[in-house]
């Protein structure tokens, strides 16, 4: 594939150079400044390269020293650098490609001593003049395509064709152009699939964005974009963002506004359209672009550009002459008909006035039969619903009585009043067809649905097994402790001074006693809500939702067993009191020392680590039976039931211990540790 000795492919579209072949270009001196006088300020800079002017100290020759970093993104870039050197060596001697003169290597970078193009970049001319003339653009594209053809004949795709990589050999475009920067070029041939996501956003082809195999025709897409930019000064697919630009490229959203392409020849637009095809196989190759009529022959192109408007003008003149002849014939026929009508009318003053209107109507009808297009001042206009046609009617030769006046009137009427029936024009917008690979450019719409307040899902087992899904709000409140509002007990409403701490703890004991009674009785649970009045209300456990619970909470109704109502998760019932709502209710009651205790230490309940409530109650001989039976029952329940059901038994024991403490006149501050 490559005739050059010492250059060979290494895979992934890259080339390598043999060490013996590379020695002929390497500069033996370790310091480049000893041989060349290198300017410190670069006149071109890229991501991984900087170009500075270098002057040979012995010969005085000027070069463009391109300094390439040998490490990019913490990885070695020796393969890419050698590939660029190999491509430049293959292009040695080509007039439209910069030549490589020498290579200098250091630990940090590699310097390529390239041919210096004194005219600078083509982008500089576009920045100063906005766009080129069509003759300049044609000459520029011809030079670029010659360089591309040289590369494509060697199965090399440039893949980064843009005005910044096209250099002027002199001050003018006519002095010659040279192609440069082969850093992302790749070898593309049959049997080698090369996929690269590299290039300039405005110039990349659709197959690059779709990560499809590249080909030599990928450069032809950039040729079409470059031609568009040179003729108009604007990017054909440029958007506000890169994503919008890529979408326009994938859909080939190509337009030619009149304010940009009003003076551009149709063959130039045809050249752009043939190059900008979504499918690579539908595009022209480099040879086909050079053979296109826009680039092939300047003289024939100029003749076609100037002869086409001239032929259009001649056709318009012929149509005008035919229309004038038809107008004269029409006027003669109208005059004859009016004379015949005037001969049969009576010599009265009202008859001519009554007869003039039918004559005019007949004339208009006749005019509609003769002309398919209305005329206005000798110019043709298309028949549209909103257009106005002015038709002159000649009546100067009519004989009239002294009481009547003959005038020449111009009647204005809409063009849809003609005799011919015109079909309405149907504007059909051509459907833009994307490539087969363009399957990801879809538009999605987001619909926001508000949740339903409460949804009840029934089951075949009846109402008791039904599941209630409560979905109340999209933004639940922050998890906070519910506030408890209660009235002052009537027994302490007198003037006796009682501490707030004692009252609160007394309320906790009373509420614990009330909850225990409710759990014993079964059925409904009596509780007080933190946001309502303190009156007790019988409610279902599955009808209340905390503000701190998740967005959607599922509650299941439980059936009562053994006369005791319980839930699988007591902490999720907001109607319970603070003593029973969690597993951290701290209640430790100490009674007075008693000599005789019938409750041994082994009967004390070993509460799990998650619960910190422990009941250790000892009393006199009369109350020891209650404490012993309560502790024994709690221990027995812990051995045979799930550990989540231990809370209400602790409350029962606490209630009995509180009753014992009340009978022994214990103070509240002595028996509670918060």
Swiss-Prot record:
Residues 526-541, 555-564 have a biased composition (Polar residues). Gene3D superfamilies: Phosphorylase Kinase, domain 1, Transferase(Phosphotransferase) domain 1. One of its GO terms (cellular component) is nucleus. The active site is at 160 (proton acceptor). Coiled coil: none annotated. GO terms for molecular function: ATP binding; protein serine kinase activity; protein serine/threonine kinase activity. GO terms for biological process: imaginal disc-derived leg morphogenesis; imaginal disc-derived wing morphogenesis; intracellular signal transduction; morphogenesis of an epithelium; positive regulation of apoptotic process. Pfam families: Pkinase. SUPFAM superfamilies: Protein kinase-like (PK-like). Its EC number is 2.7.11.1. The keyword Cell inner membrane does not apply. Belongs to the protein kinase superfamily. Ser/Thr protein kinase family. This is Death-associated protein kinase related. It comes from Drosophila melanogaster (Fruit fly).
């Amino acid at each position: 594939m490559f005739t050059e000795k010492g250059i060979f492919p290494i895979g992934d579209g890259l080339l390598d150079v043999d060490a013996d072949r590379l020695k002929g270009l390497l500069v033996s001196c370790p310091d480049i400044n000893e041989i060349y006088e290198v300017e410190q300020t670069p006149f071109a800079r890229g991501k991984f390269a900087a170009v500075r002017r270098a002057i040979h100290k012995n010969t005085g020759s000027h070069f463009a020293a391109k300094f390439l970093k040998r490490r990019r993104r913490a990885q070695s870039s020796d393969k890419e650098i050698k590939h660029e050197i190999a491509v430049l060596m293959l292009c040695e001697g080509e007039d439209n490609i910069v030549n490589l003169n020498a290579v200098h290597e250091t630990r940090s970078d590699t310097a390529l001593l390239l041919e210096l193009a004194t005219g600078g970049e083509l982008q500089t001319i576009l920045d100063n003049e906005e766009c080129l003339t069509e003759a300049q653009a044609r000459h520029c594209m011809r030079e670029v395509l010659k360089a591309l053809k040289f590369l494509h004949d060697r199965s090399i795709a440039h893949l980064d064709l843009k005005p910044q990589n096209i250099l002027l050999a002199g001050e003018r475009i006519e002095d010659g152009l040279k192609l440069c920067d082969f850093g992302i070029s790749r070898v593309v041939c049959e049997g080698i699939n090369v996929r690269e996501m590299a290039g300039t956003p405005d110039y990349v082809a659709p197959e690059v964005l779709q990560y499809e195999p590249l080909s030599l025709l990928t450069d032809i897409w950039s040729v079409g974009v470059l031609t568009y930019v040179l003729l108009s000064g604007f990017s054909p697919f440029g958007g506000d963002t890169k994503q919008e630009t890529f979408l326009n490229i994938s859909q080939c959203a190509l337009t030619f506004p009149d304010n940009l392409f009003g003076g551009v020849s149709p063959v130039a637009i045809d050249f752009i359209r043939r190059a900008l095809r979504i499918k690579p196989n539908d595009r022209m190759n480099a040879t086909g672009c050079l053979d296109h009529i826009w680039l092939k022959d300047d003289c024939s192109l100029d003749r076609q550009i100037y002869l086409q408007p001239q032929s259009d003008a001649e056709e318009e003149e012929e149509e005008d002459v035919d229309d004038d002849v038809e107008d004269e014939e029409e006027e003669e026929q109208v005059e004859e008909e009016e004379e015949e009508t005037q001969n049969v009318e009576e010599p009265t003053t009202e008859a001519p006035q009554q007869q003039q209107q039918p004559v005019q109507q007949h004339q208009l009808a006749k005019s509609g039969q003769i002309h398919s297009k209305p005329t206005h001042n000798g110019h043709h206009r298309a028949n549209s619903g909103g257009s106005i046609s002015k038709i002159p009617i000649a009546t100067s030769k009519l004989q009239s009585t002294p009481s009547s006046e003959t005038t020449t009137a111009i009647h204005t009427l809409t063009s849809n009043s003609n005799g011919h029936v015109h079909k309405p024009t149907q504007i059909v917008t051509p459907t833009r067809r994307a490539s087969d690979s363009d399957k990801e450019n879809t538009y999605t719409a987001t619909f926001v649905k508000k949740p339903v307040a409460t949804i009840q899902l029934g089951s075949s087992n009846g109402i008791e097994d039904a599941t209630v899904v409560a979905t109340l709000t999209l933004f639940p409140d922050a998890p906070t402790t519910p506030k408890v509002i209660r009235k002052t007990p009537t027994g302490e409403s007198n003037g006796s001074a009682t501490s707030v701490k004692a009252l609160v703890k007394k309320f906790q004991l009373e509420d614990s006693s009330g909850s225990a009674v409710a759990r014993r009785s079964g059925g409904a649970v009596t509780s007080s809500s933190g946001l309502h009045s303190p009156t007790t209300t019988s409610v279902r456990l599955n009808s209340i939702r905390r503000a701190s619970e998740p967005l959607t909470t599922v509650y299941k109704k439980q059936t009562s067993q053994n006369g005791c109502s319980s839930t699988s998760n007591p902490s999720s019932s907001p109607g319970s009191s603070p003593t029973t709502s969690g597993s951290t209710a701290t209640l430790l009651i100490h009674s007075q020392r008693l000599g005789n205790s019938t409750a041994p230490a082994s009967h004390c309940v070993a509460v799990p680590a998650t619960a910190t409530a422990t009941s250790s109650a000892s009393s006199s001989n009369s109350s020891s039976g209650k404490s012993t039976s309560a502790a024994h029952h709690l221990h027995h329940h812990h051995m045979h039931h799930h550990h989540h059901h231990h809370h209400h038994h602790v409350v029962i024991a606490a209630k009995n211990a509180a009753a014992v403490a009340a009978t022994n006149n214990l103070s509240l501050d002595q028996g509670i540790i918060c």
